[in-house]
């Protein structure tokens, strides 16, 4: 092969090598951009999956709480109505004069005992369904659980101490079915300062009255 032919072929081979290098570089750049794009999409998918998982967990917790509340408070309205019946039974018993109770009439005594047993059985049934009695005599007055009816001058106990329960209250779970109606001490020594009281249970009766 002549020197002239070699000289003509050399530039062609150099140009081809340069073009091939450019194609390779372009391919690498394209692959890198695709990799960056895929990594970004992967991060977005991971973030979306985490959000969905968090939403599902929140939904599970809300559902569990709703089911628990439904089971706990399903009888709340019925229990409140039954408390009114229990109050009437107790008023009927309290209205019977002592001499009448002490009389020797067997039939009358049996009637009194029947009414008393009925009231106790009703309260026992409510207690089995989560209803608890609030009898706060001697405790510090708490508006979350108690309703003050009057004040009693009593220097022997701290002010705002419950000294008399006019009507017991009742709660179910963390809710107050009916606050205890009480009389509180007035004029005694002040109760020592305490830590801030956490919000109490929902007072359904107070909200209903409002």
Curated annotation (Swiss-Prot):
Keywords: Chaperone, Cytoplasm, Stress response. It is found in: Cytoplasm. Residues 1-26, 191-210 are annotated as: Disordered. The keyword Ligase does not apply. GO terms for molecular function: adenyl-nucleotide exchange factor activity; protein homodimerization activity; protein-folding chaperone binding; unfolded protein binding. GO terms for cellular component: cytoplasm. GO terms for biological process: protein folding. InterPro entries: GrpE, GrpE_coiled_coil, GrpE_head. Gene3D superfamilies: 3.90.20.20, Head domain of nucleotide exchange factor GrpE. It holds the Pfam family GrpE. Residues 1-12 have a biased composition (Basic and acidic residues). NCBIfam families: PRK14140.1, PRK14141.1, PRK14150.1. Belongs to the GrpE family. Participates actively in the response to hyperosmotic and heat shock by preventing the aggregation of stress-denatured proteins, in association with DnaK and GrpE. It is the nucleotide exchange factor for DnaK and may function as a thermosensor. Unfolded proteins bind initially to DnaJ; upon interaction with the DnaJ-bound protein, DnaK hydrolyzes its bound ATP, resulting in the formation of a stable complex. GrpE releases ADP from DnaK; ATP binding to DnaK triggers the release of the substrate protein, thus completing the reaction cycle. Homodimer. This is Protein GrpE. It comes from Mesorhizobium japonicum (strain LMG 29417 / CECT 9101 / MAFF 303099). The gene is grpE.
């Amino acid at each position: 092969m002549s020197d002239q032919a070699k000289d003509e072929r050399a530039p062609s081979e150099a140009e081809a090598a340069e073009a091939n290098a450019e194609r390779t570089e372009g391919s690498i750049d394209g692959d890198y951009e695709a990799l960056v794009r895929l990594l970004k999409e992967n991060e977005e998918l991971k973030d979306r999956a985490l959000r969905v998982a968090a939403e599902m967990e929140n939904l599970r917790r809300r559902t569990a709480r709703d089911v628990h509340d439904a089971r706990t408070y399903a009888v709340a309205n019925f229990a409140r109505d039954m408390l009114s019946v229990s109050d009437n039974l107790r008023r009927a018993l309290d209205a019977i004069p002592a001499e009448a109770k002490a009389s020797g009439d067997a039939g009358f005594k049996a009637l009194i005992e029947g009414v008393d047993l009925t009231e106790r059985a009703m309260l026992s049934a409510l207690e089995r369904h989560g209803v608890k009695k609030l009898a706060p005599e001697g405790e510090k007055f708490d508006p979350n659980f108690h309703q003050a009816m009057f004040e009693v001058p009593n220097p022997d106990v701290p002010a705002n101490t419950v000294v008399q329960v006019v009507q017991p209250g009742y709660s179910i779970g963390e809710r107050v079915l009916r606050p205890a109606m009480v009389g509180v001490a007035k004029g005694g020594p002040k109760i020592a300062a305490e830590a801030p009281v956490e919000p109490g249970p929902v007072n359904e009766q107070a909200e209903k009255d409002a």
